[in-house]
Amino acid sequence: MSDILQELLRVSEKAANIARACRQQETLFQLLIEEKKEGEKNKKFAVDFKTLADVLVQEVIKENMENKFPGLGKKIFGEESNEFTNDLGEKIIMRLGPTEEETVALLSKVLNGNKLASEALAKVVHQDVFFSDPALDSVEINIPQDILGIWVDPIDSTYQYIKGSADITPNQGIFPSGLQCVTVLIGVYDIQTGVPLMGVINQPFVSQDLHTRRWKGQCYWGLSYLGTNIHSLLPPVSTRSNSEAQSQGTQNPSSEGSCRFSVVISTSEKETIKGALSHVCGERIFRAAGAGYKSLCVILGLADIYIFSEDTTFKWDSCAAHAILRAMGGGMVDLKECLERNPDTGLDLPQLVYHVGNEGAAGVDQWANKGGLIAYRSEKQLETFLSRLLQHLAPVATHT
């Protein structure tokens, strides 16, 4: 089944190429911004955007996976609808043509007849991409295709993508904002159990050539199925974090000052959570944009924990990273349920699942992570972190 993961790596790189191509030329990029309709808006942001790049990426992933694995394209779900309305009021369903010329014709309708822009985009969409990881060649795992579902966030952190800041200074390796926070997220889950099985995170904008102004990216993946756990971060990226993790394992977790966790949070995090975190983490609280990027910071060992207490992340935001973290021995859990859970009962941690929507919810809210989330690399670390967090949270905070 590594052939599915290999293909996901390839289409994620094609997606990254589209994201870079759309961002490269400012005049083209301005044409691509479409405001989202009311039912599709993420309520966290006053203004949220749907870009043609978003829709193109999602359709490219669907089309490519369906061509290679018939039937799988119908089980790919994501944030974006594929409907556009152009300046003439025409409703256009975005479907990729089998040829570059047919895609040009459709894109021309979306872009109000702008042939040059349509040709430039169609070329990237139909361009062959050769991208794989030799580490997957030796992997032989048989996962039945009919149990697989796929969540896609074609361009996570759309606001940072549109803003396009390229000169943000990182804080201990973590970018608070900017193009580095943009990710392409593809998560594969078991449609029967909701357990994440495979994840790909492609970061299209990692480093920029100062002469050509062109960007290079990076891709990360993980697979966790029936006891087989492999990922692209062997050996681990951050030796700093490894040594800290080892020291945390040897120190007394009940000793308040013995060690500090590092945590990455959203700038919009609740004051009650931030206040408690200041006791648990001290100065090691980092702010960053994008749910995918914050999860990636945990995967890369730049932070121990990603915590988010609100209900404005969704299945497509978390599935890819969750699968990679599972392959690393970590996971992603429901924050509200964790805070209400009695660790002495021996019950399993409330892992996020991906196959059922929220009862009674409509639109995107049916796929929201309603209880918030915590992403982590080590279960032992998480248990210690939660016990300390609860010591500093007012009782009301666990029920909001």
Swiss-Prot record:
<feature type="binding site">
    <location>
        <position position="158"/>
    </location>
    <ligand>
        <name>1D-myo-inositol 1,4-bisphosphate</name>
    </ligand>
</feature>
<protein>
    <recommendedName>
        <fullName>Inositol polyphosphate 1-phosphatase</fullName>
        <ecNumber>3.1.3.57</ecNumber>
    </recommendedName>
</protein>
<dbReference type="InterPro" id="IPR050725">
    <property type="entry name" value="CysQ/Inositol_MonoPase"/>
</dbReference>
<feature type="binding site">
    <location>
        <position position="153"/>
    </location>
    <ligand>
        <name>Mg(2+) 2</name>
    </ligand>
</feature>
<feature type="binding site">
    <location>
        <position position="54"/>
    </location>
    <ligand>
        <name>Li(+)</name>
    </ligand>
</feature>
<comment type="similarity">
    <text>Belongs to the inositol monophosphatase superfamily.</text>
</comment>
<comment type="function">
    <text>Mg(2+)-dependent phosphatase that catalyzes the hydrolysis of the 1-position phosphate from inositol 1,4-bisphosphate and inositol 1,3,4-trisphosphate and participates in inositol phosphate metabolism.</text>
</comment>
<keyword id="KW-0597">Phosphoprotein</keyword>
<feature type="binding site">
    <location>
        <position position="268"/>
    </location>
    <ligand>
        <name>1D-myo-inositol 1,4-bisphosphate</name>
    </ligand>
</feature>
<dbReference type="GO" id="GO:0052829">
    <property type="term" value="F:inositol-1,3,4-trisphosphate 1-phosphatase activity"/>
</dbReference>
<keyword id="KW-0460">Magnesium</keyword>
<comment type="pathway">
    <text>Signal transduction; phosphatidylinositol signaling pathway.</text>
</comment>
<feature type="binding site">
    <location>
        <position position="294"/>
    </location>
    <ligand>
        <name>1D-myo-inositol 1,4-bisphosphate</name>
    </ligand>
</feature>
<keyword id="KW-0452">Lithium</keyword>
<feature type="binding site">
    <location>
        <position position="156"/>
    </location>
    <ligand>
        <name>1D-myo-inositol 1,4-bisphosphate</name>
    </ligand>
</feature>
<feature type="binding site">
    <location>
        <position position="317"/>
    </location>
    <ligand>
        <name>Mg(2+) 2</name>
    </ligand>
</feature>
<feature type="binding site">
    <location>
        <position position="312"/>
    </location>
    <ligand>
        <name>1D-myo-inositol 1,4-bisphosphate</name>
    </ligand>
</feature>
<dbReference type="Pfam" id="PF00459">
    <property type="entry name" value="Inositol_P"/>
</dbReference>
<feature type="binding site">
    <location>
        <position position="79"/>
    </location>
    <ligand>
        <name>Mg(2+) 1</name>
    </ligand>
</feature>
<feature type="binding site">
    <location>
        <position position="153"/>
    </location>
    <ligand>
        <name>Mg(2+) 1</name>
    </ligand>
</feature>
<dbReference type="GO" id="GO:0046872">
    <property type="term" value="F:metal ion binding"/>
</dbReference>
<feature type="binding site">
    <location>
        <position position="291"/>
    </location>
    <ligand>
        <name>1D-myo-inositol 1,4-bisphosphate</name>
    </ligand>
</feature>
<dbReference type="InterPro" id="IPR000760">
    <property type="entry name" value="Inositol_monophosphatase-like"/>
</dbReference>
<comment type="subunit">
    <text>Monomer.</text>
</comment>
<feature type="region of interest" description="Disordered">
    <location>
        <begin position="238"/>
        <end position="258"/>
    </location>
</feature>
<dbReference type="InterPro" id="IPR044897">
    <property type="entry name" value="INPP1_dom_1"/>
</dbReference>
<feature type="binding site">
    <location>
        <position position="290"/>
    </location>
    <ligand>
        <name>1D-myo-inositol 1,4-bisphosphate</name>
    </ligand>
</feature>
<keyword id="KW-0378">Hydrolase</keyword>
<feature type="binding site">
    <location>
        <position position="157"/>
    </location>
    <ligand>
        <name>1D-myo-inositol 1,4-bisphosphate</name>
    </ligand>
</feature>
<feature type="binding site">
    <location>
        <position position="80"/>
    </location>
    <ligand>
        <name>Li(+)</name>
    </ligand>
</feature>
<feature type="binding site">
    <location>
        <position position="155"/>
    </location>
    <ligand>
        <name>Mg(2+) 1</name>
    </ligand>
</feature>
<feature type="compositionally biased region" description="Polar residues">
    <location>
        <begin position="238"/>
        <end position="257"/>
    </location>
</feature>
<feature type="binding site">
    <location>
        <position position="270"/>
    </location>
    <ligand>
        <name>1D-myo-inositol 1,4-bisphosphate</name>
    </ligand>
</feature>
<keyword id="KW-0479">Metal-binding</keyword>
<dbReference type="InterPro" id="IPR020583">
    <property type="entry name" value="Inositol_monoP_metal-BS"/>
</dbReference>
<dbReference type="GO" id="GO:0046854">
    <property type="term" value="P:phosphatidylinositol phosphate biosynthetic process"/>
</dbReference>
<dbReference type="GO" id="GO:0004441">
    <property type="term" value="F:inositol-1,4-bisphosphate 1-phosphatase activity"/>
</dbReference>
<feature type="modified residue" description="Phosphoserine">
    <location>
        <position position="318"/>
    </location>
</feature>
<dbReference type="InterPro" id="IPR020550">
    <property type="entry name" value="Inositol_monophosphatase_CS"/>
</dbReference>
